[in-house]
Amino acid sequence: MAGDMRKITLEKVVLNMGVGQSGNAVEVAKRALGEISGKKPCGRDAHETQRDFGVRKGEPIGAAVTIRGEDAGALARRLFEAKGGQVKGRSFDDFGNFSFGIGEHIDIPGIKYDPGIGILGLDVCMTLSRPGYGIRKRSKHKARVGRSHRITATEAKDFVVREFGVEIV
């Protein structure tokens, strides 16, 4: 029973598409993310004005969707398959998170080419957690997760290899 608090789980998968311009491109990105995840994506606004790119602060320039629970695990398997079952070792940070990019969204199993969408790339960020990690997010009496209870990069890599059969390159 002592090992139950040390069990690592996949907390969430975040898919992000930054298109760099507002208008129809953002709607197309939302449609593509909705098709991939089965959830409704939200728009991401520009944090600051970039005159060179014609982007104003507050203007929607991307789309993102967060998937949690059982759906996150199923989606993660599809995303790893799109990457050929390999993730770079440098994709992992020191806190149990890792990210990678997918160059063409049609590489994901179950996604067919749609001429209305075209071919888009996306960023994938996955967050791992352990029981007890909720103390850093609760509204009252927030606390830090102790150093010995944090997920290290090595533990995260072992989890991904064991749970998803992914090769770390």
Swiss-Prot record:
InterPro entries per the UniProt record, alphabetical: Ribosomal_uL5, Ribosomal_uL5_arc, Ribosomal_uL5_C, Ribosomal_uL5_dom_sf, Ribosomal_uL5_N
Keywords of the record:
Ribonucleoprotein, Ribosomal protein, RNA-binding, rRNA-binding, tRNA-binding
Q: Does the keyword tRNA-binding apply?
A: yes
Q: Which Gene3D superfamilies match?
A: 3.30.1440.10
Cystine links in this protein are: none
Kindly list any coiled-coil regions of this protein: none
Q: Is Transcription given among the entry's keywords?
A: no
MF GO annotations: rRNA binding; structural constituent of ribosome; tRNA binding
This protein's GO cellular component annotations are: ribonucleoprotein complex; ribosome
Question: What Pfam families does the record point to?
Answer: Ribosomal_L5 (PF00281), Ribosomal_L5_C (PF00673)
GO-annotated biological processes = translation
Function (record text)? This is one of the proteins that bind and probably mediate the attachment of the 5S RNA into the large ribosomal subunit, where it forms part of the central protuberance. In the 70S ribosome it contacts protein S13 of the 30S subunit (bridge B1b), connecting the 2 subunits; this bridge is implicated in subunit movement. May contact the P site tRNA; the 5S rRNA and some of its associated proteins might help stabilize positioning of ribosome-bound tRNAs.
Describe its assembly. Part of the 50S ribosomal subunit; contacts the 5S rRNA and probably tRNA. Forms a bridge to the 30S subunit in the 70S ribosome.
**Family designation:** Belongs to the universal ribosomal protein uL5 family.
Q: Which HAMAP family does the record cross-reference, listed alphabetically?
A: Ribosomal_uL5_A
Cite the PANTHER family for this sequence: 60S RIBOSOMAL PROTEIN L11-RELATED
Protein's recorded name: Large ribosomal subunit protein uL5
